[in-house]
Amino acid sequence: MKASQFFISTLKEAPADAEIVSHKLMMRAGMIKKLGAGLYTYMPVGLRVIRKVEQIVREEMNASGAVEVLMPVVQPAELWQETGRWDKMGDEMMRVKDRHERDLVIQPTSEEVVTDIARTEIRSYKQMPVNFYQIQTKFRDERRPRFGIMRGREFTMKDAYSFDRDAEGLKVSYEKMYGAYTRIFQRFGLEFRAVAADNGAIGGSGSHEFHVIADTGEDAIVYSPDSDYAANIEAAEALAPAMPRGAATEALTKTHTPKRAKCEAVAEQLGIALQRTVKSIVLAKDVEGGEPQIWLLLLRGDHELNEIKASKVPGLADFRFATEGEILRAFGTPPGYLGPIGTKQPVKVVADRTVAAMSDFVVGANEEDFHYTGVNWGRDLPEAEVYDLRNVVEGDPSPDGKGTLAICRGIEVGHVFMLGTRYSESMSATFLDENGKTQPMMMGCYGIGITRILGAAIEQNYDARGIIWPVSIAPFEVVICPVGYDRSEAVRAEADRLHAELAAAGIDVILDDRGERPGAMFADWELIGVPFRVVVGERGLKDGKLELQGRRDEAAAAVAPADVLATLKSRLAQ
């Protein structure tokens, strides 16, 4: 391809509303153009990257035995009403009416539609396993679209849905998809981690997220450097302390702590470690036809509540944080001085595993400007129910018993779920087993954010000059930059010869024949991020050399024209 037959439109400065690196560089490189809030046109450079991402995904999905379909973007509301998600999805799901006043959905995902396909097409256990996948547009009406394509409203996603006869079959399908995803991200050339995850709103049992590692990632990834253990922060288990609880050595004392509403301030006044303080978090669980049930969760002063874990405490599903009025009624004091001793109303007390192992600790006294010191379980307050309630921190023991935990940042780009029978039961997607009995299908779902991959890849691979694409998903593998293409017959002839030679060898190459000055030409392609550049100039030709430089190379190498193809093949294969 020649640049004169392509479309290149770069910017020296990013638009003012571009917040993160990938958004800025995609706008500057002319990959995307903003149309509205969270809505982008993919320009030729960006679309070429998308097509390469799609190709890798499609090849690995097909190799895994999945079958491609294409489901409509607009879907009837009746299917979503069957599963209850018409009401549960909230405002992120775009609802519209057609001219006949029929309710429709602009799909955010396709569990309902694919389950409808399965219940009408699959009758017998002999037709399973089957895995349908699509690469299709999705729409989620984000409250605050931001970060370019990383949190846009319209995006492209690969979503797959497996159907099996039993849990064992689902496990096999899940492992196939896990393996396919691993190969996909390896082929992308990105540093990534697959981590154990919570299933969230989609539901089901097993779940893993695939994260591209990047310092700017929104998600905290927990892993052990000494093993394969990895999980997102929501799912990582915080083990109970290995040491048993120490004996009480202090008397219970009510201590004046004026204007010390935070654990840090209390610890500073008392001259103790923050780890000896306990924070109180008040939750409420609404009861139909009655007063809300108030819960008091106790965490060590330096730890943070994990809301996902809290929601899994028996009786705390769908909790909310208590209002100030509810707190005053239950404890008689505003937040900052709350504790489990001497509450005004009965509350349900739950302690984190770490707190349950503490002795001689500090809690609020349920009186403004006062805390209790020397608090001990069994003596000063009854033993509480104990659960894992907190986020892990660096240095915690790994749940697999191998080493201690480290934390990095990641961008979620893929997710695999074991759905089980959640959708098949609600939509009556059943089959006849070998005994002629009706059984619900076991489902799995598997998503990859196709367009999100672009942003994540850039967040991981860039420098001051622009994007640095991995070879497999770069818009072009090689750019030929002739200096004086429109002035020198020798330069033009060699550039055209090399372009034809590389293209014939199957290399994705573009020849910049726009006649730009060398500095501007080089800057454009460094910004766009093409992995390799070959410079053809009169001076080099006189010496029998061309300049070849990788995007990450500090300097160009002089290569004989006859050796460029072999050199590039070797570099591209690395």
From Swiss-Prot:
PROSITE patterns: AA_TRNA_LIGASE_II. One of its GO terms (cellular component) is cytosol. Its EC number is 6.1.1.15. It is found in: Cytoplasm. Belongs to the class-II aminoacyl-tRNA synthetase family. ProS type 1 subfamily. Homodimer. NCBIfam families: PRK09194.1, proS_fam_II. Consists of three domains: the N-terminal catalytic domain, the editing domain and the C-terminal anticodon-binding domain. This is Proline--tRNA ligase. The lineage of its organism: Bacteria, Pseudomonadati, Pseudomonadota, Betaproteobacteria, Burkholderiales.
